[in-house]
Swiss-Prot record:
Belongs to the UPF0134 family. This is UPF0134 protein MPN_344. InterPro entries: DUF16. Residues 47-62 have a biased composition (Basic and acidic residues). Residues 47-104, 194-216 are annotated as: Disordered. Residues 68-78 have a biased composition (Pro residues). It comes from Mycoplasma pneumoniae (strain ATCC 29342 / M129 / Subtype 1). Pfam families: DUF16 (PF01519). Residues 83-93 have a biased composition (Low complexity).
C-alpha cells in the first residue's frame, strides 16, 4: 500500500528528491464525491507517495506502546470542586453545559515529532544559523576594513597627485624663466655681433687709408 503524506511533506520531498514519474492510481470517495489521487515515484525511495488533499490523516497512527489502564477518577463532590480551567470548573466557559465540543482531527506523538523535524528543516533552509550569521558578519567586517584601507590609499594618492601638480607648475614656471633668460642672452649676443661687424668694417676702412698713405 503506498504511503500517504501531507501536502507540506510532499512539497519538501519534491524539493529534496528527484521525481521519476507520476500516475493517477485510484479515486476515493469523500462526502459522496469521487476524487482522483496521484501516485508519485521518487529516486532513492523504496516506497511510493500518494498526494493527499488533507494535511493530516483522518485516523491517528497506532502507537506501539502497551495500553496502560487509567485509574478511575474520584467523584467530584461539594468538598472537591473542579479545578480552574477544567470542564465544570470556575473558569470553564461551558459550565452548566455538559456537552463539550470534540476535536475533528487527532495527531499522534509520532506525527508531532515528524512535524517538528520538518519545521526545523524548513527553518534551517530559510533562516541562517548563528555560525552562518557570525561568518557573514566577519566577512562584512573584512570588507569594511578593506574599503577603509582603499579609501585611505585613494586619499594619499590624491594628495600625491596634488603635490605633483604643484611641483609641475613650479617646474613649468622655472622653465619659462630659463627660456626668457636664454632669449635675452640671445638678443644681447646678436647686438654684440652687430657691433663687432661694425668695428671690423671700420678697421677695414682704416687699413685701406693706411695703404693709400704708404703708397704716396
Amino acid at each position: 500500500m503506498p504511503k500517504i503524506i501531507s501536502k507540506r511533506k510532499f512539497n519538501i520531498l519534491r524539493k529534496t528528491k528527484e521525481e521519476i514519474f507520476s500516475q493517477i492510481v485510484y479515486t476515493k470517495k469523500r462526502n459522496g464525491l469521487h476524487k482522483a489521487a496521484k501516485e508519485y515515484y521518487f529516486k532513492d525511495k523504496d516506497f511510493t507517495i500518494i498526494e493527499d488533499q488533507q494535511d493530516r490523516p483522518d485516523k491517528p497512527e497506532e502507537l506501539d506502546t502497551p495500553d496502560i489502564p487509567k485509574p478511575p477518577k474520584p467523584p467530584k463532590g461539594p468538598d472537591q470542586p473542579e479545578e480552574p480551567g477544567q470542564p465544570g470548573g470556575p473558569d470553564d466557559p461551558n459550565s452548566g453545559n455538559k456537552k463539550m465540543p470534540k476535536p475533528d482531527e487527532f495527531v499522534t506523538h509520532r506525527q508531532l515529532q515528524e512535524f517538528k523535524k520538518d519545521l526545523l528543516v524548513e527553518l534551517h533552509e530559510i533562516f541562517p544559523t548563528k555560525p552562518e550569521l557570525k561568518r557573514v558578519e566577519e566577512k562584512v567586517d573584512v570588507l569594511f576594513e578593506l574599503q577603509k584601507a582603499q579609501g585611505e590609499q585613494i586619499r594619499i594618492q590624491g594628495e600625491q597627485i596634488k603635490e605633483l601638480k604643484v611641483e609641475q607648475k613650479a617646474q613649468g614656471e622655472t622653465l619659462q624663466l630659463i627660456l626668457q633668460t636664454l632669449q635675452k642672452m640671445n638678443d644681447r649676443l646678436d647686438k654684440i655681433e652687430g657691433k663687432m661687424d661694425k668695428m671690423e668694417s671700420r678697421m677695414d676702412k682704416m687699413e685701406t687709408r693706411l695703404d693709400k698713405l704708404e703708397s704716396k
